[in-house]
Amino acid sequence: NTTFEEIICLLYDIELPNQERLDSMTARIGEARVLPEEIQKVITELAGKTSPMSTLRTVVSALGHYEKNVPLNELPPKALRLVGQIATAVAMIHRLREDLPLIEADPKRGHAEDFLRMLLGKEPSQTQIEALDLYLILLADHGFNASTFSARVTAGTLANLHSAITSAVGTLSGPLHGGANEKAMEMIIE
């Protein structure tokens, strides 16, 4: 009985939010789903020419251009922006690859709801929203997998946040990590 935004608050503040804090966090993530125009152009250029994960990896790296390097204690706002930005990028990549019209982010919606709306091009059902919230919560609690390890190694060198997440996305694309899910889905579809 929780949402992804509540878990983000828990990770961010080390405590569950009250309604005011939850509303504030939901709004901040929503605002972050609006991508810079230059990044939208990068996605449009690459989406049909490279794999989805290669496009996403490049986009995460390019998003780093818009962020200045900050001390470690100032990383949470950057990470929060990436949560919103990655959702929009993934939806755009999918829709461009399927030759579907793009759906603009709606910062007033919850994260799972807006991501599904941008991805599917229609209003998601409450069941779909709850399922995605649950999936995102499980991912937030995934612990120590290969992509997390990769991000930690990169961050451990004091590289910036976008470099660490770019490394994680690259690792996730491998057939023995996230790529395995892609192959399983292909088999299910066949």
Regions found by a protein language model. Name each.
Residues 1-190:
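Hydrophobic alpha-helical bundle cores within soluble ligand-binding/oligomerization subdomains
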